[in-house]
Amino acid sequence: MVDDKEKNMKCLTFFLMLPETVKNRSKKSSKKANTGSSSSNSSKLPPVCYEIITLKTKKKKMAADIFPRKKPANSSSTSVQQYHQQNLSNNNLIPAPNWQGLYPTIRERNAVMFNNDLMADVHFVVGPPGGTQRLPGHKYVLAVGSSVFHAMFYGELAEDKDEIRIPDVEPAAFLAMLKYIYCDEIDLAADTVLATLYAAKKYIVPHLARACVNFLETSLSAKNACVLLSQSCLFEEPDLTQRCWEVIDAQAELALKSEGFCDIDFQTLESILRRETLNAKEIVVFEAALNWAEVECQRQDLALSIENKRKVLGKALYLIRIPTMALDDFANGAAQSGVLTLNETNDIFLWYTAAKKPELQFVSKARKGLVPQRCHRFQSCAYRSNQWRYRGRCDSIQFAVDKRVFIAGFGLYGSSCGSAEYSAKIELKRQGVVLGQNLSKYFSDGSSNTFPVWFEYPVQIEPDTFYTASVILDGNELSYFGQEGMTEVQCGKVTVQFQCSSDSTNGTGVQGGQIPELIFYA
């Protein structure tokens, strides 16, 4: 009895994902089947391999809205045109006698059949109304590549139509999936990768789905992390979700100020506002929430009023830790935004100033943020009467990591002759391209300790690639310098390798010199 129930559930799951024509036909056949015995009914259930992974019905955001465009705006249609040209080329090859002999492997011969009308026994009308493409297919090849296609063409509820409509998949994404099934090639583009992931999930092509996720992880940045977080939850990809959180936590202010933040759904907004480890000032969180509310009003066709902004924010407003803002930020920002009621504004002012603090609906405990890690590359430091001097020359070192990290700043030495102030220009480059830089001052107390100098925003560092860390210091006093430098340092779970940089003109290298510490989040 339990087995029958399980089979029925699998059958129902499969049935819900079938095209309407199959559903209607199966309903008619089920009426006929009711006249038979129960054992006969159970024998007609599809086998276990027909179980379908259903996708959530919430609308997925297209990758073209997430990634910076590297192609023209019509690159999706361009992809379809390229596939169409390949279709014409394939068809032109067929009249040649013994064309099979031109290709030594089964993979190459199968590739000729990709997007080819020769021997096609099914056609797909793919895409929403007004944007459809009619694509040829070969049932045997498709069934070998996907258990869903196997069920559609060879299962108990097999589709017997010559033409199948698929309105919920983009043509370019469907073609990318077919190319993988026919040619064993993965051809992904930034503007179609999410749609391809949707197709791979729908038709259970797991290796292609994994490749899509890897593509998204590689392309992940503060600009698209919030939107990808929302999408990764919809696609049920926990590894991608975790990667998104790592970026959002470490580069919170950049992520919150990105255009993509305004495109997230309400549930994702709540998750971000609730996040304990956001590395951001609370006034930035507040302003980001208001920006999201403005766009949400437009999505809901509401007037852009203070009342409507508060309405769409709802209870999420109380996830913003307004009482933890600097008093100036609150007085000049949140208090004058109009979003807070007069009572809320008064109570928060009392929270800042009164000995007896009022009860607030807002969270009053500051976020923990992330704890920075320090990678120290020298085993000792020293000073001599004739070193180390700064004359506006560059101290530089190259480094690489084995895991993605976010460089927040450098730890620098100070004066070896008592207290002194230094002006420091720090810079981080990859293959000559500046990724981050900052000009600031720091005060040293005469000790051999290192003193942190920060970038404006943490810089994302990818694994297995060398980056160049540079600093130009301006100070009159002699400085401490590092000795017994290490080429490889283990910092927690991150391994950092160092090598000399050609940019260094003041004597710094692997064995000794300046830039003793990298400060990072991991």
UniProtKB/Swiss-Prot annotation:
Protein keywords: Cytoplasm, Neurogenesis, Nucleus
Tissues in which the protein is found: Strongly expressed in the primary visual cortex.
SMART domains, alphabetized: BACK, BTB
Residues in BTB domain copies: 120-190
InterPro entries according to UniProt: BACK (IPR011705), BTB/POZ_dom (IPR000210), PHR (IPR012983), PHR_sf (IPR038648), SKP1/BTB/POZ_sf (IPR011333)
Localization terms from the record: Cytoplasm, Cytosol; Nucleus
CDD domains for the chain: BACK_BTBD3 (cd18524), BTB_POZ_BTBD3 (cd18348)
Any GO CC annotation of this UniProt entry: nucleus
Keyword DNA repair: no
Function according to Swiss-Prot or TrEMBL: Acts as a key regulator of dendritic field orientation during development of sensory cortex. Also directs dendrites toward active axon terminals when ectopically expressed.
Name this polypeptide is given: BTB/POZ domain-containing protein 3
Organism lineage string: Eukaryota, Metazoa, Chordata, Craniata, Vertebrata
Gene name in the database record: BTBD3
